[in-house]
Amino acid sequence: MALKIRLSRGGSKKRPYYHIVVADARSPRDGRFLERVGAWDPMLPKDGPRVKLNEERIQYWLGQGAQPTDRVLRFLDAVGLKKRPNRNNPHKGQPGKKAQERISAAKQVAEAESAPV
């Protein structure tokens, strides 16, 4: 049984509230879970009280092989429970084709202006 530490949505329409739960990876988002280990209220204005975690139980479930989802991993990294690896996107920071064409055209114009007549 693959375990996930993930978010389960609660609250009313347009007022989300999430429970951080340990659940089987195959169960629905708001379905059956094994244990509730925290909560996240994204509507609160300050970051501190937004996230509440039961760190002892989370450590236990991580030891049992539960894998946190990306959003939960961000919370765990913020409190120092589990390190979130940096993503490697080498092509994302590069400009697109049109931008590269504009840059090369600007370089050619600059070279032509700086060349002696």
Swiss-Prot record:
Pfam families: Ribosomal_S16. Residues 81-117 are annotated as: Disordered. GO terms for cellular component: cytoplasm; small ribosomal subunit. Residues 81-90 have a biased composition (Basic residues). The keyword Ribonucleoprotein applies. Coiled coil: none annotated. InterPro entries: Ribosomal_bS16, Ribosomal_bS16_dom_sf. One of its GO terms (molecular function) is structural constituent of ribosome. GO terms for biological process: translation. Keywords: Ribonucleoprotein, Ribosomal protein. The keyword Ribosomal protein applies. Belongs to the bacterial ribosomal protein bS16 family. PANTHER family: 30S RIBOSOMAL PROTEIN S16, SMALL RIBOSOMAL SUBUNIT PROTEIN BS16M. This is Small ribosomal subunit protein bS16. The lineage of its organism: Bacteria, Pseudomonadati, Pseudomonadota, Alphaproteobacteria, Hyphomicrobiales.
